[in-house]
Amino acid sequence: CIDTGMKREKARAEQAFELAEQGKTVCVISSGDAGIYGMAPLVYEMKRERGSRVEIEVLPGISAFQKAASLLGAPIGHDFCVISLSDLMTPWDRIEKRIHAAATADFVTAVYNPKSEGRHCHRYSYKQI
C-alpha cells in the first residue's frame, strides 16, 4: 500500500508505475474523477515519457460536475468546459488564460477546486473574469 496523501500524487504514481514495470499487478485507487484532475493523467504521462509497455486500465465513475449539475437540476448539455482553480500542478497564469477563453466562448463552465486552505484569491479572480 502506497499512501502519500494530498500534494504527493506524482510520487505515489511514480512508485506504483515502478512496481508495474517490475511486473507486479498494481491498482491505483484515489478519490475524485479518475481522468479529470485525478491520477489517470499522471500515470499516462509517465507511460509516454518512459516509452513503457505497461498496460493501463482506467475505471472511471460519474464525474463530480455531472452529479452536481444533476442535483442542482441544471444538466450540462451542448458545449461546456471544466476548469480547476488549483495551481498545484498548473501555473495560475495558464489557468487564468483558460478562464478568459471559456468566458469569451460563452461556455457553461464547471469549476473544480474553487478554494483551499492556502489559496483564497483564485476564486475571486475567477468571479471577476
Spans of model-derived segments:
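Residues that cap or flank secondary-structure elements
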Residues: 7-8, 57, 90, 121
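Non-catalytic terminal and connector segments of soluble metabolic enzymes
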Residues: 10, 14, 19, 99-105, ...
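Class I S-adenosyl-L-methionine
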Residues: 1-56, 67
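A contiguous loop/helix-start segment that scaffolds small-molecule binding in enzyme catalytic cores
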Residues: 24-26, 104-129
